[in-house]
């Protein structure tokens, strides 16, 4: 442990990660570092220290944990962030650093929803032509290659940063960042005559409005299921529970605000 207090490394720039960083950084007995993947050109500011970029696999992360004298690791990455959760589990085990995963609950279909679960973006692209001709893609700019061969479909693509090829030839891009409102999503579907929605099961409340709008409009939704996560890692559903975990781990820290 360094003289600046217990060092907490938070992986991720999600809403949960930002709220958690703000809560923990308010405690002078803790030193908080947030690590971002660097996939967004202008990420939102985070309290505490921030590092951007990968670690170089589990070995690189383990080395960083040792060199920076990290006392606890919290994985608050996006449910579709790739291999980082597995890297975190291996690195934490290798250097014996306590690890907690913040995993927001997934979305649950309700009466009136017309959802079709698929295992991947490629699966979504395969199922798409049978469901509609004008698709609203909210799966992020990184996965557009899976839909690039669908030349006869039209796509509305919403992402934080501009997408890059390969991507569908008939496409309109909407650069925007949540949270979104049901009223706004309802108008978006109407204005663009969207007849099918494609999304990942991110579970975020900030982007759930599109599902309500789709239900109201009778628009079918292709939902990409979440990838597997490492087994045996303690999990909580949100930042409040993560704060409690840190409080129990380091009971000498002053009460959090």
Could you say what each language-model-derived stretch is?
Residues 76-77:
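K/E-rich alpha-helical interaction surfaces of small helical-bundle regulatory domains
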Residues 1-72, 82-86, 92-102, 108-111, ...:
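SAM-dependent methyltransferases
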């Amino acid at each position: 442990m360094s003289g600046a207090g217990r060092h907490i490394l938070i992986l991720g720039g999600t809403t949960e990660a930002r709220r958690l960083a703000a809560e923990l950084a308010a405690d002078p007995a803790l030193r908080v570092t947030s690590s971002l993947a660097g996939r967004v050109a202008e990420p939102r500011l985070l309290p505490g220290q921030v590092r951007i970029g990968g670690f170089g696999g589990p070995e690189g992360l383990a080395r960083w944990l040792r060199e920076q004298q990290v006392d606890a690791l919290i994985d608050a990455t996006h449910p579709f962030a790739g291999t980082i959760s597995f890297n975190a589990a291996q690195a934490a085990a290798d250097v014996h650093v306590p690890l907690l995963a913040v995993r927001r609950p997934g979305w649950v279909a309700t009466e009136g929803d017309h959802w079709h679960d698929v295992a991947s973006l490629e699966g979504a692209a395969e199922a798409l032509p049978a469901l509609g001709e004008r698709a609203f893609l909210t799966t992020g700019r990184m996965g557009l290659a899976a839909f690039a061969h669908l030349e006869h479909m039209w796509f509305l693509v919403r992402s934080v940063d501009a997408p890059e090829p390969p991507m569908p030839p008939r496409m309109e891009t909407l650069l925007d960042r949540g949270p979104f409102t049901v009223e706004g999503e309802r108008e978006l579907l109407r204005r663009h005559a969207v007849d099918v929605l494609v999304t990942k099961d991110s579970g975020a409340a900030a982007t759930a409005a599109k599902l309500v709008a789709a239900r109201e409009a009778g628009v079918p939704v292709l939902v990409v299921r979440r990838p597997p996560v490492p087994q045996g890692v303690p999990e909580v559903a949100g930042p409040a529970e993560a704060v409690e975990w840190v409080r129990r781990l380091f009971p000498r820290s002053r009460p959090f605000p």
